[in-house]
């Protein structure tokens, strides 16, 4: 894997900087590294493809070295270099695609394609290593079963979940009280509602709670908390739990009271925030508990009082909500996040070449299913294919 990254980094630098008119002295280090790569690769043969519709291709290496000059690089020099660079880039692209289409239930962190296994051989260690990539650094740690750490921005840590629970209901669905939520990606939105606006509740207050368990623990997370759940702020028709009917939800938004957010790790409370909104931090957690209250306003203008009558029909439904968004965090496991295209790159290659469903990944690389059942085997394989996708993205956009 380190060799694959180092070759790609060398090719990227060469493609960007070996241009006509450049002084040789300005790129001599790159050219020397480029020549070392050629010397190491010459005389070797590789084969890629042969899975799904990814075609089998054979690769041979027999390239001349780039020479030295005291002058600027001329068109002939650059053209010779470009021919070699383009062949190597095509090779790296196919090695990466081959690797991204393969999976294994055992030791999925290790190279799975024949080409990458061969590149892991001792003879290729002469290629100048560049391990500056976060993915390469973590791949090395994971390969040795040491603790890894990925920095994510808006990590897709929450499997998609959208539903509701009713604490009070009737066959006519005309006086309901309960909770509805939408968890997806890096965001939780949860709303508590009461058609009667807590009129018959103790102290005219309804208590709501929403607990979310993460599939992987996060550390040093920066989080935004807002006293609103905008996705539940407009009327909608909702299917009943048994699917036999539908019911009408027409929210009127109130501010939540006594808001408390707890972050827990293995059942132990690590951080607690009460009535605090905006940016907060959480040190280490695998569970989030949100609790909040809906309180019937003790004083109301006639217009507000008309919204919340003391008897049916209840045409407007008192609603309070919270939004929790994970803006950034560190995780020991690889995840998809908003700043990267690794999941899209891997999925696109597997779809384009009709890769059959294997023993590890779900059909279509369905992220909700993948993160819901995030086994050690999936973690190993995902880290490997994301590492390869990050290498490929240096050369192929």
UniProtKB/Swiss-Prot annotation:
Gene3D superfamilies: 2.60.120.170, Viral capsid alpha domain. The N-terminus is blocked. Zn(2+) binds at residue 153. Intermediate capsid protein that self assembles to form an icosahedral capsid with a T=13 symmetry, which consists of 230 trimers of VP6, with channels at each of its five-fold vertices. This capsid constitutes the middle concentric layer of the viral mature particle. The innermost VP2 capsid and the intermediate VP6 capsid remain intact following cell entry to protect the dsRNA from degradation and to prevent unfavorable antiviral responses in the host cell during all the replication cycle of the virus. One of its GO terms (cellular component) is viral intermediate capsid. It is found in: Virion. It comes from the Viruses. Its main location: virion. Residues 62-73 are annotated as: Interaction with the inner capsid protein VP2. Signal peptide: none annotated. Keywords: Calcium, Capsid protein, Intermediate capsid protein, Metal-binding, Ubl conjugation, Virion, Zinc. The VP6 trimer contains a zinc ion located at the center of the molecule. The zinc ion is not essential for either trimerization or transcription activity of the DLP. Zinc-depleted VP6 has an increased sensitivity to proteases. Transmembrane segments: none annotated. Homotrimer. Interacts with the inner capsid protein VP2. Interacts with the outer capsid glycoprotein VP7. Interacts with the outer capsid protein VP5*. This is Intermediate capsid protein VP6. One of its GO terms (biological process) is fusion of virus membrane with host plasma membrane. One of its GO terms (molecular function) is metal ion binding. It comes from Rotavirus A (isolate RVA/Equine/Japan/HO-5/1980/G3P[X]) (RV-A). Coiled coil: none annotated. Belongs to the rotavirus VP6 family. Ca(2+) binds at residues 266, 286.
């Amino acid at each position: 894997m380190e060799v694959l990254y180092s070759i790609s980094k060398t090719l990227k630098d060469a493609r960007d900087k070996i241009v006509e008119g450049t002084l040789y002295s300005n790129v001599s280090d790159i050219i020397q590294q480029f020549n070392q790569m050629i010397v190491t690769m010459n005389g070797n043969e590789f084969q890629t493809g042969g899975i799904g519709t990814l075609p089998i291709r054979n690769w041979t290496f027999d390239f001349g070295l780039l020479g030295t000059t005291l002058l600027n690089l001329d068109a002939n020099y650059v053209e010779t270099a470009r021919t070699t660079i383009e062949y190597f880039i095509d090779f790296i692209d196919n090695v990466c695609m081959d690797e991204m289409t393969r999976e294994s239930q055992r030791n999925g962190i290790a190279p799975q394609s024949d080409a990458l296994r061969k590149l892991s051989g001792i003879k290729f260690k002469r290629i100048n290593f560049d391990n500056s990539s976060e993915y390469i650094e973590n791949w090395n740690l994971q390969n040795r079963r040491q603790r890894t750490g990925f920095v994510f921005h808006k990590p897709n840590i929450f499997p998609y979940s959208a539903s509701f629970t009713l604490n009070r209901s009737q066959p006519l669905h005309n006086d309901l009280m309960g909770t509805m939520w939408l968890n997806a990606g890096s965001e939780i939105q949860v709303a508590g509602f009461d058609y009667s606006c807590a009129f018959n509740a103790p102290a005219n207050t309804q208590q709501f709670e929403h607990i979310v368990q993460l599939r992987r623990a996060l550390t040093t997370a920066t989080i935004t908390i807002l006293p609103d759940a905008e996705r539940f702020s407009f009327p909608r028709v909702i299917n009943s739990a048994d699917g036999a009917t539908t019911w009408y939800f027409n929210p009127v938004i109130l501010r939540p009271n006594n808001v408390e957010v707890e972050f827990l790790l293995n059942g132990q409370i690590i951080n607690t925030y009460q009535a605090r909104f905006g940016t907060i931090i959480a040190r280490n957690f695998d569970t989030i508990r949100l609790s909040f209250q809906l309180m019937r306003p003790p004083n109301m203008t006639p217009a507000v009082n008309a919204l919340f009558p003391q008897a049916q029909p209840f045409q407007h439904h008192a609603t309070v909500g919270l939004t929790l968004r994970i803006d950034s965090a560190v995780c020991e496991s690889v995840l998809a996040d908003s700043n990267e295209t690794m999941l899209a790159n891997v999925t696109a290659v597997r779809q384009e070449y009709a890769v059959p469903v294997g023993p590890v990944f779900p059909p279509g690389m369905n992220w909700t299913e993948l993160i819901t059942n995030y086994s050690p085997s999936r973690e190993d394989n995902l880290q490997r294919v994301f590492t390869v996708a990050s290498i490929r993205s240096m050369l192929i956009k």
